[in-house]
């Protein structure tokens, strides 16, 4: 049962005696935010225009996961957010409409789950590595979760095993799951329990379905796969934190095609590829960018097979993206 939402004329009568409130943002829809108080009640909150533009280069300065302070609105229908507590971390993406702005997807995250699939829809490595770079930059632990394993033939199994080997060797934990057969679901639930998790991945990879299986009472809308484009139709247009009956808290994020490397200097990008960063300590030049420089330990690592070629190619791709794209 959903928590009650405060508001209405009867509540307005008591506003003058109310102290400013504090809570956690559990839902974001444009300029409207649902804030959950410690007692379980929820309050609809907005933000003042001047609060939105005070040096914040985000289209939404408040995001799901934020711990905020608010004042009760004069009309008695909710509150106005006035402050945001310092964040432990956050996940961002490029704004769909403003290329020089970014959109906060989630904050104060304990664990990020990157759901991927080798089929329907197939997740590409540039998507994976862009997400991992952002997670590294903002210090969010990641588990790579392979879904739809019941649909895999020999080529898909081989690709999954290869990617698992690549990312496990770097230090990322990889797990496998089939939402159709429920294989691996309990292991995922055990890992999520007691944490605030964010689930990211291409639309259609199974994010909403996973939440429904973990707690059938949620009944989230799920999308079908487009036969023509093999891309899931977007079913989540806002971010929301779900508190499941099993003690699991999940932030469901909008369907995304890629994450931006906002606030990461080009010369520092390799810092967020752990294996490239480790190898860089042996480069001849201390300011080596691992592009065309001589005596580059990173390029030597790629040639020897110690560094994944696909990872290095994705690094080069991100380095070559036009200047100013993420700034």
Which residues make up each language-model segment?
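Arginine/glycine-rich "motif VI" loop of SF2 helicases in the C-terminal RecA-like domain
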Residues: 133-140, 166-169, 278
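C-terminal effector/interaction modules appended to NTPase cores
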Residues: 14-136
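Helix-rich effector regions associated with P-loop NTPase G domains
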Residues: 19, 31, 57-75, 86-105, ...
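A conserved segment at the C-terminal end of the G1
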Residues: 208-220
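Conserved beta-strand/loop subsegment of P-loop NTPase cores
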Residues: 109-116, 139-149, 171-176
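Canonical P-loop GTPase G-domain recognition
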Residues: 151-205
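Positively charged N-terminal leader segments that act as targeting/secretion signals
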Residues: 1-10
């Amino acid at each position: 049962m959903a928590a009650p939402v405060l508001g209405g004329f009867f509540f307005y009568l008591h506003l003058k005696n109310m102290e400013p409130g504090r809570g956690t943002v559990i839902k974001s829809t444009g300029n409207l935010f649902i804030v959950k108080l410690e007692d379980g009640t929820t309050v609809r909150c907005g933000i003042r225009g001047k609060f939105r533009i005070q040096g914040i280069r985000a289209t939404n300065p408040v995001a799901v996961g934020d711990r905020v302070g608010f004042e009760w609105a004069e009309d008695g229908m909710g509150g106005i957010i006035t402050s945001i507590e310092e964040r432990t971390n956050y996940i961002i993406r490029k704004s769909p409409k403003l290329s020089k702005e970014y959109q906060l997807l989630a904050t104060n995250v304990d664990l990020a789950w990157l759901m991927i699939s080798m089929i329907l829809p197939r997740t590409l490595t540039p998507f994976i590595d862009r997400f991992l770079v952002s997670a590294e930059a903002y210090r969010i632990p990641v588990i790579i979760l392979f879904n739809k394993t019941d649909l895999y033939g020999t080529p898909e199994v081989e690709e999954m095993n290869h990617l698992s080997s690549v990312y496990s060797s770097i230090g990322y934990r990889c797990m496998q799951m089939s939402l159709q057969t429920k294989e691996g679901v309990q292991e995922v639930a055990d890992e999520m329990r007691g944490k605030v998790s964010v689930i990211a991945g291409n639309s259609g990879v199974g994010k909403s379905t996973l939440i429904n299986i973990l707690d059938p009472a949620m009944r989230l809308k799920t999308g079908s796969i487009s036969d023509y484009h093999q891309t899931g139709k977007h079913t989540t247009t806002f971010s929301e934190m779900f508190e499941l009956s099993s003690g699991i808290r999940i932030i469901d994020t909008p369907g995304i095609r890629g994450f931006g490397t906002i606030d990461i200097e080009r010369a520092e990008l390799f810092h967020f590829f752990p294996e490239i960063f480790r190898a860089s300590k042996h480069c001849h030049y201390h300011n080596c960018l691992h592009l065309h420089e001589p005596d580059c330990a990173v390029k030597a690592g790629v040639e020897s097979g110690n560094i994944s070629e696909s990872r290095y190619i994705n690094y080069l791709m991100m380095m070559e993206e036009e200047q100013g794209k993420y700034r």
